[in-house]
Amino acid sequence: VNPLPAKPPEQFIADFFTTFTDAVVHASEDASDLMSRYYTRDVVQVADGVPLDWERLVAHLRPVRKNLREFRFEVHEAFADGDRIATRFTIHARMRKGGPVSTRVHMFAEFTPDGLLRRAEQLTRAVAPGEPNGGE
């Protein structure tokens, strides 16, 4: 992952989540080893009020690896201030069972200088099929 100043924040976020998710789905590498390329060991990601530490994030990768078939990250906007990024993006996915699923994510995140995610606060909501991309 490139350092934050190396690319615009929208591109950094798109690349971060796309390459990470691609590795989760397609690589045979151990989940913990994979995580260490994208997250700090002391990571805390709070999603809709639920805190996820390193162990809970690693555990979350198992069902993602098993069930995710297709995915795309659509970054609507992102703003960087030093090592922090505020962003709004949509995850478009197709799972092993069921139809397409889209989730809007509003995230405030802190990264290390070398691009590892240290902390994130996320609010998410399901996006209805056909809802405009801006959606708010």
Regions found by a protein language model. Name each.
Residues 1-8, 62-136:
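A beta-strand edge to alpha-helix "cap/lid" segment located at domain peripheries
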Residues 2-41:
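Short acidic-aromatic low-complexity motifs
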Residues 13, 17-21, 39, 57, ...:
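Hydrophobic alpha-helical core bundles mediating ligand binding, dimerization, or RNAP-core interactions
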Residues 21-25, 43-44, 94, 113-116:
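Short linear sequence elements within intrinsically disordered, low-complexity coil regions
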Residues 26, 55, 100-103:
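Residue-level recognition of alpha-helix initiation/capping sites
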Residues 29-82:
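A solvent-exposed, acidic/Ser-Thr-rich amphipathic alpha-helical stretch
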